[in-house]
Amino acid sequence: MKIVDLVCSKARTGFFFDDQRAIKKGAVSDGAAYFGETVTPGFKSVRQAGEAISVMLILEDGQIAWGDCAAVQYSGAGGRDPLFLAEDFIPIIEKYIKSELVGKEADSFKGLCEMLENIQVDGKRLHTAIRYGVSQDRKSVV
């Protein structure tokens, strides 16, 4: 089955992104919220809505396969990948992954995973959330 397009959509996760370093430096908990200054790059507040990217593969017969690129609660802490904001990472998916998939046969899950593991942006592997989500949509096709 040939992939004819790749579409990205900003989504929400089922939980929050928390700036763990700010919490450890004394951000005050007030129920479901935290008050204090952010410490980790990319955070606009100590606790903010979790974001994801739904990646949809449009197949030649009209079927749509999808996967959700989602990161962990404490992004950017303890050696984890940076905060996963859709506006920052949709352009990366569109630039580096779309061209690798559109026009190709969706016939090898292993091949997709190898391709994803080998893509580098500025000398770094793709964000874990991208590798996770894009492999989900391909798995639903193969």
Predicted segments with their positions:
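Short, Gly/Pro- and small/polar-rich lid/capping loops
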Residues: 1-56
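Metal- or metallocofactor-binding catalytic centers and their adjacent structured scaffolds
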Residues: 58-142
